[in-house]
A protein has these predicted regions:
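Fe-S-dependent hydro-lyases/dehydratases of central metabolism
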Residues: 1-216
Length: 216
């Protein structure tokens, strides 16, 4: 309920009570009702994200977890209910767009500026149902927070998911929170001869700060 705490309507409050009752009757231990933080941060912090996993959630920004090398995407409530009930779901395998980012961040530029620049170029529907694969020297040197920021915004260009190959900082982060060794992780990498539906290149050397504003 992290996006709606405290409940702002009677309907929301009643819905949350139904969920809490369900959690208790099903003895679900991994639940974060309130006071924990936003799920996009809490889920990886609690060690619930690993590379190579398929993760779905009832929020469009579930794609955040691609920063950790997972295929992660949001879906509707009905689809997610079926995942809960059956443990299965159906996907059309998305084509991939390679987004290579080169150059170095200057003191006035953050990963949010980079992703806003990318979205501005490709458009809000330019990557619809595609995988946005972020790579390049600028991505390789980027920390956990910056990577999460970029993958979080993949949906804003229509992408099915955003994903990055985990670097050492990400791997160490995951190992610390899951208690696993690097050798136990299923780190997925693109083949050197991988074929993409489109390739885009962004040099951030001279990039300026960006501000997003409503399109209407």
């Amino acid at each position: 309920f992290d996006h709606n705490i405290p409940a702002n309507t009677i309907g929301s409050a009643e819905f949350q009570k139904v969920c809490r009752d369900f959690i208790q009757t099903q003895n679900i231990t991994k639940n974060f009702i309130h006071g924990e933080g936003i799920c996009h941060q809490v889920v990886p912090e609690m060690g619930l994200v690993e590379p190579g996993k398929v993760i779905v959630g009832a929020d469009s920004h579930t794609c955040t977890y691609g920063a950790f090398g997972a295929f992660s995407t949001g879906m509707g409530a009905t689809d997610l209910a079926m995942v809960w009930a059956t443990g299965k779901t159906w996907f059309m395998v998305p084509e991939a767009i390679k987004m290579e980012v080169t150059g170095e961040l200057n003191p006035y530029i953050a990963p949010k500026d980079i992703i806003l620049n990318i979205i501005g170029e490709i458009g809000i529907a330019g990557a619809t149902y595609k995988t946005a694969e972020f790579c390049g020297p600028a991505i390789e040197s980027m920390g956990v927070e910056g990577r999460a920021t970029m993958c979080n915004m993949a949906i804003e260009m229509g992408a099915k998911n955003g994903i990055m190959e985990p670097n050492k900082e990400v791997i160490d982060y995951i190992c610390q929170r899951t208690g696993k060794k690097e050798s136990e992780l299923n780190i997925v990498k693109s083949d050197e001869d991988a074929v993409y539906s489109k390739e885009m290149h962004f040099d951030i050397t001279d990039m300026e700060p960006h501000i997003a504003y409503p399109n209407d």
